[in-house]
Amino acid sequence: MGVFGSNESSSMSIVMYPWLAFGHMTPFLHLSNKLAEKGHKIVFLLPKKALNQLEPLNLYPNLITFHTISIPQVKGLPPGAETNSDVPFFLTHLLAVAMDQTRPEVETIFRTIKPDLVFYDSAHWIPEIAKPIGAKTVCFNIVSAASIALSLVPSAEREVIDGKEMSGEELAKTPLGYPSSKVVLRPHEAKSLSFVWRKHEAIGSFFDGKVTAMRNCDAIAIRTCRETEGKFCDYISRQYSKPVYLTGPVLPGSQPNQPSLDPQWAEWLAKFNHGSVVFCAFGSQPVVNKIDQFQELCLGLESTGFPFLVAIKPPSGVSTVEEALPEGFKERVQGRGVVFGGWIQQPLVLNHPSVGCFVSHCGFGSMWESLMSDCQIVLVPQHGEQILNARLMTEEMEVAVEVEREKKGWFSRQSLENAVKSVMEEGSEIGEKVRKNHDKWRCVLTDSGFSDGYIDKFEQNLIELVKS
């Protein structure tokens, strides 16, 4: 075992092995930083390709050690593929096969390190190799508790007939005892979850792997808080008959050497009045696949009349966002609108005083960043988990509005314009209601002791688990 001893101030030896995606590795590293801050030692397993991107985020290099793992070449994957960034979505199951094939190397590492704790989320076989060396296992989930409760608990199992896709009505059914009638999917939205139960040769379904991962661990951990998702966490705990530990949002805190907002954006935003700019960002993955959908988004923001900044990947078929812009758009919005295809410092933009509205896809990280900001929130979720996050924010917390869309999944420029104006125009009843509710939640979530309190409790849970 590690150097963890009889008193609670001793250091635990921890191994982290997240799914091979930056959207998973980064939150795992943020949690590693929180635990290292308390003196615990972490060995972080990751592909070689991920090292350069994650190394700068390691705040405690004396306590967090990166250990690169060789990702085997699996037939059907692009040459050299190591993370989900290298792989189209429809081949993700082959990346899971490659991860499964790292088991012998990971087992050797475990035997050498003899950790007290192992954190994982996808590699369901981790408990099988951790138990013989006496290590406790924690399945750490970086998605919302609501999405787990709806689709990744034993009661959510679906009978899948080979070769037959389930209907939207079948996919939209909530499992027995599911604790909400509001945070649900409509049949046409639920189709985006069909991949969860789809069977693949060699690895079965995503559902099988994830349920096995949570069923066999010693404890489940979720990156959320009881104030927002308590009833979903309790439901998950009952479904698996084991403890569910909550870490809180685990967002990176301000650091002494944290960079300031890129001068390009700081200077541009400074030209506008307080709270007048609409900021639109849809995360690091391509979201808007068709040029006509991309153009509807641009035209909808133009028609609001507000200044706007958009950070979005180009749609399919073009290499830059400029190629996809509507005819005459750039000239019409010059001076008040920018569409940018690169990476942008989202938390810093949200905290700029000129920004008053955030149009988001409602990924879980963006959800927390929006809640902790002072911006009005407009949501354009794209698939299952994001839609559930949006329903949590609009139907239960009532802090945001969701853009109305057609059954085929996209929205019109008019529906986007209406949603933005409903929260930004003075005297709007909807705008006043969501701002009032958002202010209450922001006060709770940004309280100086809120996040620290969750990490303190989480650490105590881990200490008790290791001692048990």
Curated annotation (Swiss-Prot):
This is Anthocyanidin 3-O-glucoside 2'''-O-xylosyltransferase. Pfam families: UDPGT (PF00201). Disruption phenotype: Strong reduction in anthocyanin accumulation. CDD domains: GT1_Gtf-like. UDP-alpha-D-xylose binds at residues 284, 344-346, 361-369, 383-386. Signal peptide: none annotated. Pathway: Secondary metabolite biosynthesis; flavonoid biosynthesis. Contributes to the last few anthocyanin biosynthetic steps. Converts cyanidin 3-O-glucoside to cyanidin 3-O-xylosyl(1->2)glucoside. Can use 3-O-glucosylated anthocyanidins/flavonols and uridine diphosphate (UDP)-xylose as substrates. GO terms for molecular function: cyanidin 3-O-glucoside 2-O''-xylosyltransferase activity; UDP-glucosyltransferase activity; UDP-xylosyltransferase activity. It catalyses: an anthocyanidin 3-O-beta-D-glucoside + UDP-alpha-D-xylose = an anthocyanidin 3-O-beta-D-sambubioside + UDP + 2 H(+). Keywords: Carbohydrate metabolism, Flavonoid biosynthesis, Transferase, Xylose metabolism. InterPro entries: UDP-glycosyltransf_plant (IPR050481), UDP_glucos_trans (IPR002213), UDP_glycos_trans_CS (IPR035595). It comes from Arabidopsis thaliana (Mouse-ear cress). Belongs to the UDP-glycosyltransferase family. The gene is A3G2XYLT. The keyword Transferase applies.
